[in-house]
Amino acid sequence: ERAFYSLACNHCEHPECLEVCPVNAYTKREKDGVVVHHQEKCIGCGNCIRSCPYGAPRYNPVEKRAEKCSMCWQRLDAGLDPACVKSCPTRALRIIDLATFDDPNAVQFPPGFPRMPGLNPSTRFRQPELPLIVRREDV
């Protein structure tokens, strides 16, 4: 069985990238939990790249620094959705409030996804719903 997931950064509650960065190029916003990478501070050491089990930070050979999804925090601050949410043609991506999110069909660790509960990723995945089985009543 195959599974395909759209992954950028999971904006973990306890992000390892933030902990291992020697120059504090990562911060976590208190108001929404977005993990921001400040590329101008990055020295390109690769600690964050090696420490993230989800492969979110990537090395940019042109800039010679790491980069990752910023959840378009500037757009969020302006009351707009991140670019990925706005441009997804199937509307598979959305921003949710985990404090009030209650979807019995959503999971934090779907099959094939690295199970790292200590990091507590904020991403949730809606599992495919089973079709409704309709049976004919005997007349």
Residue ranges and their predicted role:
Residues 1-139:
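Non-ligating segments of multi-cofactor redox enzymes
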